[in-house]
Amino acid sequence: FAVFNLTRTHESNMWEQMDGEPIAPDPAVDLEAIEVPPYFPETPKVRQSLARNYANIEYNDRRLGEILGELAEDGLAENTAVFVWTDHGPMPRGKRWPHDSGIRSPLIARWPGGIAPGTVREELVSTIDLAPTVLSLCGVEIPQHIQGQAFLGPRAAPEREYVYAARDRYDEMYDTVRAVRDKRFKYIRHYHPEQPY
């Protein structure tokens, strides 16, 4: 069992520099080809920030390829389940927000003999489901106190109807937002409606 945290897409890497030193390479992304989400202003700075994030994603993708290559070289690729989940990005409405841009992020599972390559599944899962899923794949009984539910393996649970999200703290500020989503709709409750967002 191993966990690799590729943090290049973390919020701290979206800035051009910190303390006068560059912290991310100039992105080789075509700024004009970037689709700016409708909730961002259409400015060169926003395009540069999005391009930097995409360049950081490409970096993580290359690093993941190296890790998968090492598994293959060691003869472990066909006997190893691999899960890749992503950061929700550093931009507003992503980091710390229960909007789709903050909670709908890719989860990729590679399980030789268990998942056919190219399979796409649309069920609602959450990162709290990873621990029970790993236990299920290992044939281990899932303790009652563990939150989440297995989505693969012999102890996979029936597909859930809802997922939940929350926003409580942003640095020194408190913000109370709750969300519940099914496959069609999301309800967001903001407990501080006096806030301008």
Predicted regions, residues:
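C-terminal cap/loop subdomain of S1 sulfatases and analogous C-terminal strand-loop tails that border
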Residues: P92, A131, C138-Y197
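Active-site-proximal cap/lid insertion segments
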Residues: F1-A131, L135-H145, I188-Y197
